[in-house]
């Protein structure tokens, strides 16, 4: 009987179980079952059931000089959504992500009217910061929630928070209500972004995800230009409150499509028994330490050197709070290990930390050009706020279109590493050319250089998420996705303030050199759009040269960051979303 079963098992395993060579030794018990004659006869008569048990845990860990390498068996066939349903769900996701991204920039042209209506100039910084702080601080929270709760309902809850916050902002009777609404919207927006990328992993197979991720990533580039334009249009021709009202019908459409078409999936990890174990699994202690650490850091970056001097007690206290809480958070994460919000094993994975370094550098470069290209157009070319947005369109279109094309190419070819190598090379060249701007630079230069930089950025901007989705197991993808999006936000916040410091320092130096008779401090504080109004006409060329010098020094920071992104690509192993692997590139 044993020989008969062995022959039948080998014949059926060759025919239908090519993945058995990947199974761990522990999984053989599920093949042979209890050691009694009756069970062996039953299994011999039904060999097709053998492969049903190993689904997610068929992983071996090989220890070597390169670190832990996971060899996974090909998963069971998963029923992905049909094409028409994928398209409908993606349209819904894109609408919500676009609204969430627009909320980062749509108030840029509406804030003057808001402060005029509420008489709240002292609060205008919080209209943006409340949204940013809530969005950044909740990113890892959603990453943890998505491990234990169904992504469909986490997404709907986040959407309701975002829409509720938008409604509060739209009907706000005073500045405090507007700030509270912005914080609620940011809390929901964070969940929308993280959940959207996770939904992509559910509705399409891994080889098609780069295209979908590229589409979602391109929306951030689009919102960077159209946010201020849309905000200005609402403010001029209707009311600034429509900056928030517009989210309500769009959110309704998104919610309808997700509820109707997206099948509720099961959580990637099951709850343990016992209240204490459940609290430890959620990493409540780590989250309560991480959120104040992040908020303290962002407040230091926002207030240091502007609202308060760097040696002020407020700034020193915030730095101390950040230092203590971030160290405590690191200790808790090490203690929690696989239950941590950021598992140490994930950080030790060279594909993950390489992707995070790549994301950090590239996002820092992008935020610099998003902010300081319009400043160059307004100060040097005397463009209006609206026209500067129009002049920035070559960059935005290049990033958006190349992100989509890059995603399609990775989907078609399978390999993502070549595009990630191309990004720092092309983007740093484009950024370096942008730093050669002169006061006399004409259309061919500022259009062509923007396009070159945008192509470089677009080639790899969405690929770190592809690396995460191709590298991590099902129950850690949500945390990895949250970590990438958090890194993007932190890089933007940090290098925005670095760029501001470089700009102010170089502007004062250049003004002393070009126009020593002028009050450099007064001109620097006046702003880029009014320089022609506060100096004599014969001094305008000198002031413009000073502004051009200061802005192009900031561009050099962006170029350096784009080049530094190469350091993040080097440790990432050559892999394919189609399951292929180039061994020569693995070292």
UniProtKB/Swiss-Prot annotation:
Membrane topology: Multi-pass membrane protein
Pfam families in UniProt: MFS_1
TM region positions: 87-107, 124-146, 153-173, 184-204, 214-234, 242-262, 284-304, 315-335, 357-377, 393-413, 414-434, 447-467, 483-503, 554-574
Subcellular localization(s) per the UniProt record: Membrane
Cellular compartments per GO CC: plasma membrane
Keywords for the protein's UniProt record, in alphabetical order: Glycoprotein, Membrane, Transmembrane, Transmembrane helix, Transport
Positions of glycan attachment: 382
InterPro entries per UniProt: MFS, MFS_dom, MFS_trans_sf
GO molecular function, one term: transmembrane transporter activity
Function: MFS-type transporter; part of the gene cluster that mediates the biosynthesis of oxepinamides, derivatives of anthranilyl-containing tripeptides that share an oxepin ring and a fused pyrimidinone moiety.
The family this protein is said to belong to: Belongs to the major facilitator superfamily. TCR/Tet family.
Protein name: MFS-type transporter opaD
């Amino acid at each position: 009987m044993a020989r008969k079963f062995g022959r039948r098992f080998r014949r059926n395993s060759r025919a239908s179980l090519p993945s058995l060579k990947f199974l761990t030794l522990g999984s053989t018990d599920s093949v042979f079952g209890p050691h009694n004659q009756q069970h062996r006869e039953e299994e011999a008569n039904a060999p097709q059931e053998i492969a049903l048990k190993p689904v997610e845990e068929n992983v071996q860990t090989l220890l070597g000089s390169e670190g832990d390498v996971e060899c996974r068996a090909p998963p069971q066939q998963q029923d992905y959504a049909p094409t028409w349903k994928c398209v409908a769900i993606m349209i819904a996701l894109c609408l919500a992500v676009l609204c969430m991204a627009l909320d980062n920039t749509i108030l840029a042209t509406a804030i003057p009217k808001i402060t005029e209506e509420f008489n709240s100039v002292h609060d205008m910084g919080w209209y943006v910061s409340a949204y940013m702080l809530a969005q950044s601080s909740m990113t890892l929270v959603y990453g943890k929630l998505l491990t234990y709760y169904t992504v469909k309902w986490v997404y709907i809850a986040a959407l309701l928070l975002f829409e509720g916050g938008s409604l509060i902002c739209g009907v706000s009777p005073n500045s405090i209500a507007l700030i509270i609404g912005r914080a609620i919207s940011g809390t929901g927006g964070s969940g929308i972004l993280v959940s959207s990328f996770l939904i992509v992993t559910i509705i399409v197979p891994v080889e098609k995800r780069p295209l979908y991720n590229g589409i979602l990533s391109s929306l951030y580039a689009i919102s960077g230009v159209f946010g201020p334009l849309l905000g200005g249009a609402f403010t001029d021709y209707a009311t600034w409150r429509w900056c928030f009202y517009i989210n309500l019908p769009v959110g309704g459409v998104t919610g309808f499509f997700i509820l109707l078409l997206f099948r509720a999936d099961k959580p990637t990890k099951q709850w343990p028994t016992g209240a204490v174990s459940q609290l430890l699994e959620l990493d409540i202690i780590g989250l309560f330490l991480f959120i104040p650490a992040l908020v303290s850091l962002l407040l230091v970056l926002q207030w240091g050197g502007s609202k308060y001097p760097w040696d002020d007690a407020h700034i020193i206290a915030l730095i101390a709070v950040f230092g203590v809480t971030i160290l405590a958070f690191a200790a808790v994460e090490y203690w929690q290990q696989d239950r941590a919000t950021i598992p140490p094993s994930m950080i030790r994975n060279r594909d993950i930390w390489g992707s995070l370094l790549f994301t950090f550098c590239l996002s820092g470069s992008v935020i610099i050009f998003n902010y300081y290209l319009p400043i160059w157009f307004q100060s040097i070319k005397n463009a209006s706020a609206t026209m500067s947005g129009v002049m920035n369109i070559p960059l935005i279109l290049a990033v958006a279109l190349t992100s989509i094309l890059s995603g399609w190419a990775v989907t078609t070819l399978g390999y993502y590493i070549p595009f990630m190598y191309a990004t720092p090379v092309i983007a740093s060249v484009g950024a370096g050319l942008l730093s050669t701007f002169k006061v006399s630079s004409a259309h061919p230069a500022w259009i062509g250089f923007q396009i070159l930089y945008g192509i470089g950025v677009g080639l790899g901007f969405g690929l770190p998420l592809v690396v995460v989705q191709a590298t991590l197991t099902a129950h850690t993808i949500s945390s990895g996705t949250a970590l990438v999006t958090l890194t993007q936000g932190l890089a933007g916040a940090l290098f925005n303030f670095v760029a501001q410091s470089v700009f102010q320092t170089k502007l004062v130096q250049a003004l002393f050199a070009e126009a020593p008779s002028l009050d450099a401090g007064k001109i620097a504080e006046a702003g880029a759009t009014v320089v022609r109004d506060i100096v004599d006409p014969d001094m305008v060329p000198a002031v413009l040269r000073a502004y051009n010098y200061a802005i192009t020094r900031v561009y050099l920071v962006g170029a350096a960051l784009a080049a530094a992104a190469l350091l993040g690509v080097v440790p990432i192993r050559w892999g394919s979303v189609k399951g292929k692997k180039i061994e020569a590139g693995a070292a």
